[in-house]
């Protein structure tokens, strides 16, 4: 698995505004839909279309009207993730050209689109430095960086009128918005541990929802705003606790047995959904409010690098595998009507580890 900072796996391309992206789009023609799916994937995915071409593109999330996707990308000439938007459908059926909406400085992650006020949301390190933050030290194994310079910002949909939303010390990222636009859920180390918080859309009325030692993060609201799905790993033994605290003090975590959890919007009713001991992440609700789609490497216990999409009932029953490609698939999100699915995948890449966004019709 690659770097997954926020719900993350990516980095982004900058270029001059979106010229670099346009060039990347022109490098590759539309692939035939049938070539983008394995035979097993045809049960739930049809008429798949590749949306981005080249670099690393991930965390693609629909606007509330499903007409746009906001995502992060890193590519040739750009060392750090930046945030872009792209039209889902174009009149000429050609790939749309992504538009840069973040500052082009520092590293950005975890973007989302407000439902009604023409603004976007993302986290960035640019206030601390215009340069990329340092890469993590992998001498202690595979770790994720938790940059304490991440702050949450809002901006107009074109990237102008940038406003700081959170200025608490520590890591502040992984933010998503309720469909009524009134509340934000996010992950922060402001109290010394990686916990989930909510706040109003203006940054006020901050409430801590999780309190158990360990990583609680990657939260997403249910469609009715009454529940939150998230990923968590809570160390149990003295050795695990010591290792977790030592790494966190260095701005790192070691992703291991991440499980999917659900809680009510006020933090009550926490319950574990998956129990497979694998790395499960990027959970998102199906519009029916009963099922959760997520990414996991449970089918690759030996190497742990092959992540696929699964769907499961909130009570942990009825789990079904959705993707079968022999590499990474992650960051799934349904359209509001549940008829289409966007996700990030290594399939059809022209370079090793290339990650692109794909859109498919969802079949029950």
Identify the meaning behind each predicted range.
Residues 26-46, 150:
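Blade/loop signatures of beta-propeller domains
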Residues 41-68:
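Mature N-terminal segment immediately following signal peptide/propeptide cleavage
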Residues 47-50, 95-99, 142, 160-163, ...:
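Predominantly a core beta-strand signature of beta-propeller blades
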Residues 53-56, 73-83, 102-108, 123-152, ...:
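A flexible loop/linker signature enriched in serine peptidases of the S9 family
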Residues 64-65, 115-116, 179-180, 223-224, ...:
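Residue-level detector of Asp-centered blade-edge/turn motifs that repeat once per structural unit
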Residues 69-70, 120, 184, 228, ...:
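Hydrophobic beta-strand positions that form the internal "hydrophobic ladder"
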Residues 88-91, 156-160, 200-204, 264-268, ...:
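Short loop/turn segments that connect beta-strands within beta-propeller blades
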